């Protein structure tokens, strides 16, 4: 009799664990800036059937206007959205955060890492995302990094993402218990043209995204790398931004 009860108890525990694991697999943290890439990434996570916690950062960036677009998108979708405020003093040496440094214009395609690179930004952003993912029982983090039509940032490369994912597995409770947090990079190997086409298929409201490093009076400058790449993507596809 006891043996039968033990078997039933083990069966129930196993079912409970499977149900919990399934629920965790349905949850994801999405890093959302409000730009074209991160918003397309958000819609890909939705298409993957994920229950999403969006995470954005206010770190004193010149293009903070993107956050207002992130708010619009998450409100429209009814998605939980956290904006984490960080001190600008943490991000020195970048033209995206320092008024004394000018954002490069019409310089797309140059080999060197541009001064729009923000030291340690993706490392820090992913660390916050890991905290949120583990705390909410999420098994994946979506980030819209891109290594094709990109500005040369080292923290957007596949090697960085792979290495960071290994660090997460080694340094978290979930990773040590055999339920590692995965970093999902759906745009990693896509050109800007392909990202626009993907966004179009996913029905991303492009008019609710903003891509500019140096906006003036809430309008895109049209000359920075972010503006030029966005323009290139839409021109090559013929897809409308509106």
UniProtKB/Swiss-Prot annotation:
Residues 1-25 are annotated as: Disordered. Zn(2+) binds at residues 212, 221, 224, 227. Catalyzes the ATP-dependent conversion of 7-carboxy-7-deazaguanine (CDG) to 7-cyano-7-deazaguanine (preQ(0)). Binds 1 zinc ion per subunit. It comes from Leptospira borgpetersenii serovar Hardjo-bovis (strain JB197). PANTHER family: 7-CYANO-7-DEAZAGUANINE SYNTHASE. GO terms for molecular function: ATP binding; ligase activity, forming carbon-nitrogen bonds; zinc ion binding. Belongs to the QueC family. ATP binds at residues 32-42. Its EC number is 6.3.4.20. Its cofactor is Zn(2+). One of its GO terms (biological process) is queuosine biosynthetic process. This is 7-cyano-7-deazaguanine synthase. The gene is queC. Keywords: ATP-binding, Ligase, Metal-binding, Nucleotide-binding, Queuosine biosynthesis, Zinc.
